[in-house]
Structure formats: C-alpha cells, structure tokens
C-alpha cells in the first residue's frame, strides 16, 4: 500500500463510489475520527457501517478536484445518488497519518442531501432489496 496522501485519498473515494467497502477498510486508521453535518464518530468500524448504509443510494463519486497540503487532502466530488437529490456536491478533508486516513471532515448542504437521507432511512427500514 502506498503512503502517498493523494493516492490514499483517491483510492478511498473511488472504492466508496464502487461500494467496495472491503477495499476501504485497510485505508482507514482503526481510531479514525469523523466529523460531518449532524454526526461525529470515532473508529473505523462505526464509520464503515455508515458508509455501507449510505451505499444504498450511492451510485458513484464523480471527483472534480483533489488538493493536497502535506498530509492533508481535500477531495471535491459529486456524490451521485439514485434519489431525487441526484448529484450532491461534497467536500472531504482527509488527514493521512502512517499511510491511513486518520480523520475525515465532511462538508455538504444538508438541504440538498435531504432526499437522499430520506431514501437511506426508508431503505434501511425496508430491509435488504431482492
């Protein structure tokens, strides 16, 4: 595994967009810190659970720009959903330490994301799709 912060960040975003959360897991520090609109988590396992849950509506990540400053990487992308929300602009500020993502700061418009949030909840309550 590369320790280049930009490569790690892009691998993470691409794997998330493919819903390949098994590929995401080794990119995360076990004690990862996550801060986003309405949510704060500590630990890779709870964060992966959230990613898997939102995977229900996640079609792909359409990366627009990747900015780096040492161990900090900012990824700007459209979170493309299969909901009326469509593509929601997202910014993730990732801190890479020891070749793994140590922290994630997530920024997005909660109003624009609401149709996706509603659908995530509905699908979680409905159980697995057949």
Residue ranges and their predicted role:
Residues 1-130:
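C-terminal and inter-domain tail/linker signature
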